[in-house]
From Swiss-Prot:
Extent of Low complexity compositional bias: 1-11
Acetylation keyword on record: yes
GO biological process: proteasome-mediated ubiquitin-dependent protein catabolic process; protein homooligomerization
The protein's name: BTB/POZ domain-containing protein KCTD2
Composition bias, Pro residues: 29-39
Length: 263
């Protein structure tokens, strides 16, 4: 009897395990049908399940150029008005309230922050502008709408000693000018001839200033030549009285008065 060779590809025909015919006519079980080798064609079948691997921590976001990034900037909420400046500006007065609050983070100055992260300061924002500008460029700039006393009050609150001295000096100077009152002048009218005019103007001193020269024609006739006459108006500040004591005019002032009496 010839030996029957079973093709493995034919195994599995005829149902569940696949049966064939053996030497004695009994069923012969072949090996299970192998799966086709090679990658699964696109669009057919399911991809293999990926195995989850733990993620390693990666680098954080890059810092801003300049080294400090956003940490250099400070946001202040002064009486509902926002001001933005740098920690370097606030640190120019190390003993000030602002430096201790924002730069040194003094635990004794426990200040709340709003929803934007700005420091809450319950002061008048109108007078905070001159304070912040002084820390920026070191100059005191007060507009006409602001009172110097108000700036002084804020400078004392923020404990900026140099600004306190500067505002006090300005207030003192303004008080001195107000106490002196408006500047008054004394006027003199001198009559002179043309040949005397140059000498009189050149020798004028002691605070006297030339104001106006008026020609009044010729009053004298020497032969065929007319001598022109002029009125010379001079003035000086009236500041020769102190505490009721009248200071006598100098000799040159007396000469000017005598010449003026010729009119």
């Amino acid at each position: 009897m010839a030996e029957l060779q079973l093709d493995p590809a034919m195994a599995g025909l005829g149902g569940g395990g696949g049966s064939g015919v053996g030497d004695g006519g009994g069923p012969v079980r072949g090996p299970p049908s192998p799966r086709p080798a090679g990658p699964t064609p696109r669009g057919h079948g399911r991809p293999a399940a990926a195995v989850a691997q733990p993620l390693e921590p990666g680098p954080g976001p890059p810092e801003r150029a300049g080294g400090g990034g956003a940490a250099r900037w400070v946001r202040l909420n002064v009486g509902g008005t926002y001001f933005v400046t740098t920690r370097q500006t606030l640190g120019r007065e190390p003993k000030s309230f602002l430096c201790r609050l924002c730069c040194q983070e003094d635990p004794e100055l426990d200040s709340d922050k709003d929803e934007t992260g700005a420091y809450l300061i319950d002061r008048d924002p109108t007078y905070f502008g001159p304070i912040l500008n002084y820390l920026r460029h070191g100059k005191l700039i007060i507009t006409k709408e602001l009172a110097e006393e108000g700036v002084l009050e804020e400078a004392e609150f923020y404990n900026i000693a140099s600004l306190v001295r500067l505002v006090k000096e300005r207030i003192r100077d303004n008080e001195n000018r107000t106490s002196q009152g408006p500047v008054k002048h004394v006027y003199r009218v001198l009559q002179c001839q043309e040949e005397e005019l140059t000498q009189m103007v050149s020798t004028m001193s002691d605070g006297w200033k030339f104001e106006q020269l008026i020609s009044i024609g010729s009053s004298y006739n020497y032969g065929n030549e007319d001598q022109a006459e002029f009125l010379c108006v001079v003035s000086r500040e009236l500041n020769n009285s102190t505490n009721g004591i009248v200071i006598e005019p100098s000799e040159k002032a007396k000469i000017l008065q005598e010449r003026g009496s010729r009119m």
